[in-house]
């Protein structure tokens, strides 16, 4: 089973986590849309209740550029990674989003880069073929 919609982590209870544990889950997706919501205790509780141990099967949609700053977006991404979740950045109004937000999306959603380069500050999206890419 693959839950592709972003479930509300706050609604996970021991009972429905037990039900999830009884089915074969390909991937479960949660959402952390509002940076003002402190969802860390809920994500920790799910880890305790769930038998899903592979971080790639615990994905969290992170909504960026919708009343959030770059720092808030980066905080949620780094926090989720530290907790053992796989963040996936979604940008509201992408064509008008700040360049740094689009770079963060490219960094986070390209898993080869994300798991190879430990920090966003070390990621240089303009670096092409050993030379800085001119725009």
Give the positions of each predicted feature:
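Auxiliary Fe-S-binding modules of radical SAM enzymes
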Residues: 51, 63-135
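Core AdoMet radical
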Residues: 1-46, 55-66, 86-90
């Amino acid at each position: 089973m693959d839950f592709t919609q972003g479930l509300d982590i706050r609604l996970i209870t021991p009972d429905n986590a037990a039900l999830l544990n009884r089915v074969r889950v390909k991937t479960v997706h949660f959402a952390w849309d509002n940076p003002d919501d402190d969802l860390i205790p809920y994500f920790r509780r799910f880890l305790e209740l769930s038998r899903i141990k592979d971080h790639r099967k615990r994905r969290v949609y992170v909504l960026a550029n919708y009343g959030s700053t770059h720092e808030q977006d980066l905080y949620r991404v780094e926090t989720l990674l530290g907790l053992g979740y796989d963040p996936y950045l979604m940008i509201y109004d992408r064509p008008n989003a700040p360049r740094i937000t689009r770079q963060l999306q490219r960094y986070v959603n390209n898993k080869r880069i994300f798991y190879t380069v430990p920090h966003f500050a070390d990621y240089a999206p303009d670096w092409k073929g050993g030379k800085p890419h001119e725009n």
